[in-house]
Each structure stands twice: as structure tokens, then as C-alpha cells.
């Protein structure tokens, strides 16, 4: 997004955790008011699915609390919130893509806290869009594609599951 914004005539503000603690409601309200944001994109999340089972409070602070803070600030300032969520809000048993009105049934802490974040956004009164994503990858961070590229350079043979869809 930052690279694309360089060629846009619009103004964009990007923050990271060092600049804005989205779990701090006051800091979020102040940042949104100061920037006069018209659109807020919430990409903040506690994404370590396994660790979330051990640290539910931290997962909840980011996945529900931060979403609620951003939604309330958006509502107070007339901004639209674009909220990034996950397919983990479902139980994973569907054989077809989920529709937006499919019943949710998260199986773990990560999915439950992301669903709680979706609900907090919906109940805030702000204008919003929620995107439920799956299998994201990029040149940044850890992801399946980067892992496979690294392993092919390290090993002569790989065993990879091929019965998963996303």
C-alpha cells in the first residue's frame, strides 16, 4: 500500500506499532482526529494462531480491542473502516467458498477473537467493510511461499501436503 500511495494524488498516513498502539483507545482517537482520516485500513492483528491458545488476552487486545478502538474512532470522525479479518471465523468444514452470511463457528482463540473484532466493528455504528482473508503472502514476513522457496534451496526433496484449499 505504501508503494502504491506514492503514485496517488491522495494523502496517506501509515503507522506501525512503534508509532501508534492501536490497543490504546485514546491514542487511536487522537491519531484519527489529527489526520482527519476518511478511510482507515485495519491490518493490525495477533496472527500467531498457535500462540493465541496460550495468550488469549493478548490475542483479544489486538483482534477485538484494537478493532473496536478503530471502529469507534472511525464512527466519531465520519470515516470508513476497512477491517481485515480471517477465514478462521469458520470451522473449515465447507467444501465451497464461504459466503458472507455463512454461519460462523471458530474453532480456536484466534478465530474467536477475530470474530469478536468483526462484531465490535459491526456494532460500533461506523461505516465499514470487512474482508475475510486466507492464505495471504508477500515478500514480507513468514508465509508458505517463502518457506517453500527457502526449503527448495536447502533440500533435495520435499514432502508437502496437497489436499488443502484456501
Predicted regions and their residues:
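N-terminal Rossmann/SDR dinucleotide-binding element
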Residues: 1-39, 117
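A generic structural signal for well-ordered alpha-helical segments
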Residues: 4-5, 74, 121
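NAD(P)-dependent short-chain dehydrogenase/reductase
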Residues: 122-166
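Conserved catalytic-core motifs of eukaryotic protein kinase domains, centered on the activation segment
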Residues: 50-57, 92-96, 141-142
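SDR active-site strand-loop-helix element
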Residues: 15, 40-44, 81-86, 91, ...
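Catalytic helix-loop patch of NAD(P)-dependent Rossmann-fold dehydrogenases
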Residues: 61, 66-69, 89-131, 135-136
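NAD(P)H-binding glycine-rich loop region in Rossmannoid oxidoreductase-like domains
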Residues: 25-64, 75
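A short helix->loop->beta-strand "cap" motif at the edges of active sites that frequently abuts
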Residues: 76-80, 126
